Amino acid sequence: ISYGDDELYNKNINKHSSEIAKDPLVRELVKNTLLTFYNDIPSGLVIEGRDMGSVVFPNAEFKIYLDADENIRGKRREHQSGSQETIEEIKQRDHKDMNREESPLVIPENAVIIDNTNKTKEETIEEIIEKLKL
């Protein structure tokens, strides 16, 4: 399922996603929807999200915990959405997500941790393939 970048990433969505994600009913609905979607795809899928490997798909064959410096993340987000997300907003979202009661942001068990602060998309993909031995 593909949406335009403007629909997936904009400052308004980023700002409110942590608040919405705190709601247990929303989390359960999203989780069940994703699991149903996954079960309909026999070849598997690649999915991104802050608790995909820890809560939604804890038994996934491959889990990547992708991290980068906050300044770089801010620049990348600006490039994606055309609007600037300040470093402070990124820090606040991380703090909220790590400290929320329902499904806090954690490094999933058995995840491969990759810091791509100084890597291009292509270099990041190469490292993932290498570390997962694909």
Set out the residue ranges of the language-model regions.
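Thr-Gly-centered strand-to-loop micro-motif
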Residues: 16, 47, 76, 115
